[in-house]
């Protein structure tokens, strides 16, 4: 009978410290991803595309929002459905609405880790997570009240 190899390399007695180090590393990289996305979230006012999002999610009722999205939006409605609920909970200011995208962008960091760990190793996972955490383009789109971060998040899954 063969015993499967430890998922982080090495034998069983070294497994716990290695796993702990990887988890702490992932937590640090994810924290960095959160920090850089939320640091300047409300610095700029809404731009044209974001105004479209706000106009879709501000209507009073859920059905009003769906009617607006159905009648004038070419993108799938999932982002607007989630953003509508998010705006009800966190407000319609720049930080309130953009925080959904920032959170989705930061949540992509551990997803990148899991994908790279599955494909290669825990070390590759940490490198991939670090790249996603500090990638300027991903940070930029994580600070916009648009569906881009949700698209990247689900694409990474």
Indicate where each model-derived feature is located.
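Hydrophobic/small/kink-forming positions within alpha-helical transmembrane segments
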Residues: 77, 106-107, 133
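Membrane-interfacial, low-structure loops and terminal tails that flank and connect transmembrane helices
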Residues: 1-20
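Extracytosolic helix-loop segments that constitute the early lumenal/periplasmic catalytic or substrate-binding loops
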Residues: 48-81, 85-86
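Short acidic/glycine- and proline-prone juxtamembrane loop motifs at membrane-interface regions
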Residues: 143-147
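Transmembrane-helix motifs of polytopic, lipid-linked glycan transferases
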Residues: 99-119
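Specific aromatic-rich, kink-prone transmembrane helix
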Residues: 81, 111-113, 130-134, 140, ...
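Transmembrane-helix signature of polytopic, membrane-embedded enzymes
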Residues: 22-24, 28-32, 112-134
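Juxtamembrane segments of multi-pass membrane glycosylation machinery
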Residues: 63, 70-71, 81-103, 136
């Amino acid at each position: 009978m063969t015993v499967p190899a430890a998922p982080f390399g090495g034998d069983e007695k070294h497994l716990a410290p290695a796993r702990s180090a990887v988890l702490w590393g992932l937590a640090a990289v994810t924290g960095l991803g959160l920090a850089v996305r939320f640091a300047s979230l409300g610095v700029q006012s809404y731009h044209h595309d974001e105004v479209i999002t706000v106009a879709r999610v501000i209507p009073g009722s859920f059905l009003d929002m769906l009617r607006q999205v159905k009648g004038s939006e070419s993108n799938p409605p999932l982002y607007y459905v989630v953003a509508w609920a998010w705006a009800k909970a966190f407000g319609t200011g720049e930080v309130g609405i953009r925080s959904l995208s920032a959170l989705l962008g930061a949540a992509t960091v551990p997803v990148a880790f899991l994908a790279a760990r599955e494909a290669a190793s825990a070390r590759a996972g940490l490198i991939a997570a670090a790249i996603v955490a500090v990638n300027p383009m991903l940070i930029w789109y994580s600070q916009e009240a648009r569906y881009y971060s949700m698209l990247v998040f689900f694409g990474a899954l």
